[in-house]
């Protein structure tokens, strides 16, 4: 039998630029995995940015820390066997940052870093340090760690755009 482990992240409640439907989409995907695929609820982890989960102390609050810790917890979870199916779904804001890189063959190369925006993006931590988005490079590193310890059956679904440019 196929074994699934699912991480669902849906963020509606951003300060200044809220979204609608991300939390309900994550809940609908949860329903699909439970009702249609038969995944036990204890194998589904939710991070939801809504009025019901508005406190950073809530373990379901989709802060940068909680989002980046959750995939790491998959890599170290002894119950997940090598080759099990892992699905990570994200619905929320995305971002895109341009940067310039010197290239020997070209004068200048324009590249982009794409990123996921946690609920606490555009805020600062307790030391006043700005909380960064989760870059594509960081996400790749996290997925590589999961792949190394749990196998290559990882599906990532990103329901976001990259309109917030910096």
Regions found by a protein language model. Give the residues of each.
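Signal peptide-proximal N-terminal region
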Residues: 28-43
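Short glycine-rich His-centered loop
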Residues: 1-17
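Caspase-like (clan CD) cysteine peptidase catalytic core
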Residues: 3, 59-91, 95-166
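Second-shell loop/turn segments in exported
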Residues: 14-20, 52-60, 128-129
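RNA-recognition motif
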Residues: 45-51
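Glycine- and acidic-residue-enriched helix-capping/strand-helix junction motifs
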Residues: 14-27, 31, 132
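Terminal peptide-recognition signature
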Residues: 10, 29, 88
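Structural beta-sheet core signal
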Residues: 6-8, 46, 156-158
């Amino acid at each position: 039998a196929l074994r699934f482990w699912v991480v669902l992240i849906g963020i509606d409640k951003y300060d200044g630029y809220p979204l609608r439907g991300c939390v309900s989409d994550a809940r609908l995907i949860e329903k699909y995995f439970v009702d249609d695929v038969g995944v036990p609820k204890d194998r589904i982890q939710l991070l939801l940015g809504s009025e019901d989960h508005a406190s950073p102390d809530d373990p379901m609050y989709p802060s940068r820390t909680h989002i980046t810790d959750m995939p790491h917890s998959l890599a170290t979870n002894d119950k997940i066997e090598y080759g099990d199916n892992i699905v990570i779904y994200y619905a929320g804001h995305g971002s895109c940052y341009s940067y310039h890189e010197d290239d020997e063959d070209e004068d200048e190369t324009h590249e982009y870093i794409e990123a996921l925006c946690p609920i606490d993006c555009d805020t600062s931590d307790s030391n006043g340090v700005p909380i960064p988005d989760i870059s594509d490079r960081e996400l790749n590193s996290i997925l590589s760690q999961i792949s190394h310890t749990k196998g290559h059956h990882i599906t990532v679904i990103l329901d976001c755009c990259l309109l917030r440019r910096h």
